[in-house]
Amino acid sequence: MSRAVHFPVPCPVLLGTLTDDSLEAQLHEYAKQGNYVKVKKILKKGVCVDAVNTLGQSALFVAALLGYVKLVDVLVDYGSDPNHRCFDGSTPVHAAAFSGNQWILSKVLTAGGDLRLHDEKGRNPQAWALAAGKDRSTQMVEFMQRCASHMKAVIQGFSYDLLKKIDSPQRLIGSPPWFGGLIQGSPNSSPNRQPKPGIISAQNIYSFGFGKFYLTSGMQLTYPGSLPVIGEKEVIQADDEPTFSFFSGPYMVMTNLVWNRSRVTVKELNLPTHPHCSRLRLADLLIAEQEHSSNLRHPSLLQLMAVCLSRDLEKIRLVYERITVGTLFSVLHERRSQFPVLHMEMIVHLLLQIADALIYLHSRGFIHRSLSSYAVHIVSAGEARLTNLEYMMESQDSGAHRDMTRVPLPAQLYNWAAPEVVLQKTATVKSDIYSFSMIIQEILTDNIPWNGLDGSLVKETIALGNYLEADVRLPEPYYDIVKSGIHAKQKNRTMNLQDIRYILKNDLKEFIGAQKTQTTESPRGQRYEPHPDINICLGLTSEYQKDPPDLDIKELKETGSQPHSPTDHSFLTEKTLAPQTLDSSLSAQEPDNPNVPSASRLAEEVRSPTPSEASLYSFEINEIYSGCLTLGTDKEEECPGTASSPEGDKANQVDELPSLEEELDKMERELHCFCEEDKSFSDVDTDLSFEDGDWQSDSLSSLSLPEPTREAKGKTSSWSKTDEYVSKCVLNLKISQVMMQQSAEWLRKLEQEVDELEWAQKELDNQCRSLWDASLRFANTKFLSAVGPPSLTYLPPVMQLSEPKQPENGGNWLTLARPPGNERDFQEGNFSKKSEKLSACDWNPFTQASEESRGYCSEPNNQPPTLCGPGKQNTGEQLPSTEEAKESLERNTNQNIRRMESVSSEVCDTKSRNNEDAGEARSKWRLAVKEMAEKAVSGQLLVPPWNLQSSFESKVENESTPLPRPPIRGPESTDWQYILEYQREKDELKGNMKFGKMENSDCDKNKHSSWTGLQRFTSIIYPFFRNHEQPEHNEASQASCDTXCGEKFYSTSSPIEDDFERIQSSFAQPQGYVEENFQIREIFGKNAEILTKPQFQAVQCAEDEQEETLEETPKELKEKNISLTDIQDLSSITYEQDGCFKETSCKTPKLKHAPTSASTPLSPESISSAASHYEDCLENTFHVKRGSTFCWNGQEAMRTLSTKFTTVRERAKSLESLLASSKTLPAKLTDPKRLCMFGGACSSNISTAFVTSTHSTKRKSLPGELAEATSQHHIDELPPPAQELLDEIEQLKQQQVSSMVSLENTAHDLNVTENDKKHLEEQETNSSKDSSFLSSREIQDLEDTERAHSSLDEDLERLLQLPEENMTLLDPTKGSTREKKTKDQDMVEQKRKKKEGIKPERRKSDSFLGTLEEDELKPCFWKRLGWSEPSRIIVLDQSDLSD
C-alpha cells in the first residue's frame, strides 16, 4: 500500500469522512491513502465510483486534491464525473488545479472537466490554483492559459491538422502557447510514456476544459448532440423587426435575433457581476442547461440550436428556436391587454403540451424542480415549450440525484415550488406534479400562487406549517387535479402525470366534439362555444399579428356568425320560445338560469371588481359561452308545445332583438363615457395608447344588430345569434375592464406628478416668503437722505440727437478683469432704475442726469481695456505740445461723440422717466444752482453729523444675498463663478434683474442691480491696499483678497463705524476678513480706521454716482435741508472730511466729468513751504498714476491725471505749458500695449504708495481749517517720527523735483520702473509722517497756501474751460449756455468775495485746535470751521477719487 501524502496547506476546503464499514467508506479511505490498487479492487465489486462523503466529495475529488496521479487515472478510467459538484460547489477540476500537478489536471480535462465552473464563492479553478502558492501556481496557470489559447485557435478556424497533433491537454503539458510545434517533457508529467496521437481521441472527441466537442465529417466543430459552436458576431439583430426581449426567470433574458438567416431566440445571463463576486457561479446555470438540452430531444422541449461562445470563452449564450409570444407569465400578468381572453380550448391545449414534456423528462430520470409559468414559453399561437432546465436534477440508479450546479433555487420561484424544494429537501417526481398543479390554478384564476407573496415570506410560511389549498372557484375536473396535486406531503399527491394528461385529453376531446356537433342532446358539448380563431384568444406579439384579430372581429360584426364555425345554423330545432318569453330582457331571464349572468350585472362587476372576482374573469367568460347555449334548452323545457315555423322564427327574432338591443345600447353608452374619460389621460401620457383595444372600441361605437338572416327551410336558430351578441358583449366588457385598469394606473401616475408639482410650488412659495420677510425686516427703517442736487426741482433733459449711430467700438470704458457675467452685470446693473420692491422700502428712484453719460458700448468690445479720456485714443509715444494736445483732443472727442450719440439716444428712449424739454430743465437747474450758492455763502448749509455711510449700511442690510466681490487674479478668483451664479438665481427669483443680454434695450434695470454692480466695481483697490499696508501680515492679507468685500462708499470718523463694519461683514465678508480688520486695527491703533478702509474707489459713470449718492426721499430733503456735497456737485466746491475724498458726481446736463475738488485762497503771496508739501503730494500722485492702471472711467481718468500734474511750483510763468503737457499724458496711458488689467497690473508697492500718498494729498488739499483739524487729530494718534525718516523725506523731495523736471521737458515711457517702485515705497513712509510735523508749521502753511492759490486764478480758470469746450461739441447751443452759466457763477462769487471779508485766521486755527472728535458729530461743527464765510471758488483738482 502506498504511503499517504500529507494534506497540502493551506487547503481551501476540508475533507469529508465516512465512519461506517461500507464499501463506499473503504473507497474513500483508500483514496485518501492513495492506494490505487485497493481502490481498483473495490470498484470491481460494483461500488459507485462517484460515492460521496459527508461533504459531498467524490473519490476523484480527494485524489486530485491530494495529487495522486495513478489514482486519478484509475478513477477516470472507471467513469468518474470530472464535473461532480461537492456541497460547496467545487469540482474535481478545482481540486486538480489546486494540486499543482499538470498531469492530473490534463486527465480531468480530457475526461470532460470544465475550467469555467465556479464554487459557491464564485471562484473558478484558476483562482484555486493561485491559492496554492506561487511555486505551484505558476506552471498550472500557464498550462490553463495554453489550453484556452488552443481552444481559441480551433474556434477561429485555424488548420484542423492542429487537432490531430494536439488532440488532448496532455500534449500541452510544459509546452509554450505555440501551435506549430510541440515541446514535450515536464517534471510533472505522467510516469507513463506519452500516448501517440489518435489513441485517446480515437472517436474525434476532444476536451480542453471548455466542454466536449468533436469534428464532423465536414470539419464542423460541434458539441455532442450536433450543437454548432458559433462566434458572438454570428448572432445579429434583424433589420426588418424591432428588438424583442423578455425575462425567462430571475436571472435569464431572452432576445429575438438572427443566426445564419434563421430567426432564433438567444438566452443569456442578465445579472451584473464583478470580479470575486459570488454571483459569478450563476454563469454555470447556462452550462448546465446546455448540457441537458443537448442530450434531450422532445417536441415540447425548447429546441437548442447552437452555442455561442464569447471571445474570452468565459461567457456563453444559448441559441434556441424562435419564441414569438413570450413566457406564460408575461401573457397572464404583464401583457394581458394584448391577450384579453384565453379560452378553455387554448388553455387545455397548452397544459397538455407541458404535461407531455414533463413525462418525457421523468422517463429520462430528470426532475425539473423549477417548473413555473416562467419556464413555459409560447413559441406561437397555441404552441408551448418547456425550458429552464438549469436547475434540473438527474436521478441515478442508486437513488441519488446529481445536481450539476449546486445553485439553490431562487426565491422568486418559491411561489410554484413544492414545499420540499423550498426547504431544500430531496426532490422527486411528485415535486414537479405540485408545480404543474400550481400552473393549472394560475392559468384559470389569473392569480400568481400565494397571491403574489414574496418568495422569502413563502418560505417562512411553509416552514411554519402553512400550505396552499385549491381555489374553490376552479371548474371541474381541474379542481380535483389541483386539490390532489398540491398536498403538502408527497405521498398524498396520488394523481400522477399520466392521469392528469388523460383527464385533459378527454376534456379537450369533448370540447372539439362540441364544436363539430353542437347538438342539443349533448349538454357537455354545449358547455363550450367554438371560437372564431385561436389567434383572437392568444395572438402573436403586437409586432407581428395585429391585423388577423381585427379582421376576424370585423367579420364577426358584419355576419353575426362564427367565421370558423363548422356550420352557421347547426341547431336543428322545431320548438321556439313563446312570443311573451321573447319580449323579456336578458336581465329578466337571470333568475331562470343563474348560471348565466346578465349583461347589467357584468357591467356592474366591471365597474367595481373585487380582487377575488378579478382573478376569475377569464374562466367566467368561458363559462358564459357555454352557459348561453344551455339557456335555450332550459327555455324549451319551460315552454313546451310552442308552435314553430319559419315565419314564427322570424317573428320571434324580430321581437327578441329590440329588448337585447336596449341592453347593448345601455352598455355602449357607459363604455362611451369611459372612453371619453380615457381620452383625457391620453393627453397626459401620449406614449400610452390602446393599440390592441382600438378594434374593440370601434366595435362598441358601431355595434348594430343586423337583420336576421333568412335561411331556407327555417333552419336558422334564434338563440345562435343571441349567443353571438352576448359573447361580443362579454368580450367588450373584458376589454373595458382591462382598459379601466390601465386608466386607473395612469390616473395614479398623474396624481403623483401633480403632487410633485404642488410640492415644488410650495417650496417656491416658501422661498419667496422668506425673501419677502427678509425684505420687510428693514421696510420701516429710516434712512438718511442722499447728498446731492435737490431731486425735487431737478429733472434731467431729454436730449434728441440728430445722428443716431451704432458705436463700432466701446473704447471709452475701462474693462475690468471680471467674468463675463460680472461684465454684463456691471454694464446693465449700473445703468438701471429702481424696482418697485425697493421703492417700497423708502428708496426713491432718481432719474439720470445726462443720457450722454450712458455711452457704454452695446456691442462686445474686443479691444484691450484702455484708460482713455472722453473719446481720447492713443496718440503716440511722445507728449505733444499744448496746441497739439488741444487739436488732438478735439478730433478724438468728435469721433467718440459720434460713437456715443446712437447709444445715448437709445438709452434715452428706454430709460428716460420724463419728457420735459431741455430748456425747462436748464432753467430749473440754474435756479437750483443759484439757490444753493446763496445758502453756501450765507452759511445756511447744514452738514450731517457724519457721512452717508449709514444710509449705505441700511441698504446693505436690505439685501438678502451677499454681494459678490470682483475677481482678483490667478486662482484666487476661482469661486467667482459660483458666487455670481448664486447672485443671478436670487435676482431672477425676486424679479429684480434679467441677465444674459447686453443690448441697449436691456438698460432698464432695477436699483438692486445698480447697487450690486456698484459694490462690485468699487471694491477693487481695497485688497491691494490692505495687503501691503501691514507687511508683517502679508499672508493673511493676501487671503483676504479672495473674499467678497462690501466696500464703504464714504470714509467716516463717527463712532458707528465699528458697528457698520461688523454688519457689512456679515453680508459680504467671511469671518477671516473681519478678524484681519481688527488685527490691523490693533496694530495701528485708531488710525486703522483709515488704513483698513478702502481709500479709493473706481470712478463710474455719472449715472451710477447719481443713483448711489443722490438717493433721498422728498420728505428727507425738506427735513435735512441741503448739505455741502450738494454745493460741490453744483459748483465744484469740494466737501471733504477726515482726510478722505468722496465719491461725487456732476449733475449738470452738459458735463460728464465728476465734480472737481476746490480750494479757497486767502491772499496772493509767494509760494511757501506749504505749497512745497502740496507739490510733493501731487508729484507722488503723478508717479502712481503713471505706474498703475486702476479702474478709472475714461473721462474721469483724463481729468484726474491732468489735474494731478498741476504742481504748485516757484516757476509760475511755466505753469501753463506744464499743464498743457500734463493733459496729454492720459493719451500715453491709454496705450493698449502698456495697459494692464486690474488683476495683475499693479505691484503691491505701487498700490500702497498710491493709497498712502493720496491720503496725504487729500488732507493737504483741504481748506486750511480742515487741514489744521485733521492734522491735529492725527498728531495724537501717530508716534513721533524718527530722525532717519525725516532725513529720507528731504532726500525724496530733491529726487521728486528732478523727476518732475524731466517729465516737463520730454515725453518718456510711463511704465513703472524699479526705481519708481523704490521711490513709492519710501514715499509711503514719508506720507505717514507728514501729519506728525504738519501742526508745527500749520499757520504758515495756511497763509502760503492762500497766496499760492490766488496767484493761479487766471491760469486755472482757463484750464477749467477745456471740459466746457469738449462738452460743447455735443451740443453747441447747450454748451454756450453752460459756459455762460459758469461765468455768471464766477462773477457772482467774485462780487461776494469783495463785499465780504475773510475772518481772522486766529479764529479758524483756534476753532480747529479746540475741536474734539465728539464735536465732529455735531451739525454746528462745520459752521465753526468757517464754511459759513464767503469764499472764492476755484478748481485745483478734477479727480473723483473715492473710497
UniProtKB/Swiss-Prot annotation:
Task: Give the UniProt record's GO annotations in the biological process aspect.
Answer: attachment of spindle microtubules to kinetochore; cell division; cellular response to leukemia inhibitory factor; intercellular bridge organization; male meiotic nuclear division; mitotic sister chromatid separation; mitotic spindle assembly checkpoint signaling; negative regulation of cytokinesis
* Binding residues for ATP: 205-213, 267
Q: Which GO terms describe its molecular function?
A: ATP binding; protein kinase activity; protein kinase binding
Localisation per UniProt entry:
Cytoplasm; Midbody; Chromosome, Centromere, Kinetochore
Q: Where is the signal peptide?
A: none
Task: Pinpoint the Protein kinase domain residues.
Answer: 199-512
The protein's matches in SMART domains, at most eight in alphabetical order, are given as: ANK
InterPro entries per UniProt: Ankyrin_rpt, Ankyrin_rpt-contain_sf, Kinase-like_dom_sf, Prot_kinase_dom, Ser-Thr/Tyr_kinase_cat_dom, Tex14
Q: Which Gene3D superfamilies match?
A: Ankyrin repeat-containing domain, Transferase(Phosphotransferase) domain 1
Q: Quaternary structure? A: Interacts with KIF23 and RBM44. Interacts with CEP55; inhibiting interaction between CEP55 and PDCD6IP/ALIX and TSG101.
Free-text comment about domains:
The protein kinase domain is predicted to be catalytically inactive. The GPPX3Y motif mediates interaction with CEP55.
Name of this protein: Inactive serine/threonine-protein kinase TEX14
Q: Which organism is it from?
A: Rattus norvegicus (Rat)
Species lineage: Eukaryota, Metazoa, Chordata, Craniata, Vertebrata
